[in-house]
Amino acid sequence: MALPKAKWEETRVLRERSWGEINTITKDDFKTNYARNWMFKNTDPLYWRPPAGESIADVAENRVHNLLTSLNRKSDAESVVMVSHGDLMLALMLTLEDLSDEEFMHRAASDEWKITNCTCFHYSRRDPATGRTHKRFRWEQTARPVLDETDGRWVVKVDEWREFKRPVLSNGDLVDVVHAV
């Protein structure tokens, strides 16, 4: 990336989540040797933790929160580019958008939200329509490679800007959530 006047910093915080004991085994060995853990992987992708590894929730609560605190302290009002793996990107999305467990589960199960290789998320505090800057991130735009079926070439698909708002519950909303449990 030839970004003018860029200052790059390498950090272990952006590493892929730890896959623990299953890091070096095949998927078939995982299914055979960790059958119960394999079952949980598919039913609870947010809190599922590989044996001796990290869940996406662990990554969000520990590394992503620390990363955002550090960026706030060191990079105020600067543009920041981060390059990382998909699960850390999911943890970043979970944290920045303050997703509920239910919304995270919906996205994890949806092809529309799948993070493929070379997917880019662009978060912004600047309203793309008005240029007005807000205190917190409120917009996200995704770019991802897709295969053009007509000519077999890869192209970059850039989604429209999407505004997100952190959920705030009224008293009645909170009562409804409690009753739903």
Regions found by a protein language model. Name each.
Residues 1-39, 109-119, 180:
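Phosphate-coordination/substrate-recognition cap region in phosphate-metabolizing enzymes
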Residues 76-87:
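Generic beta-sheet signal
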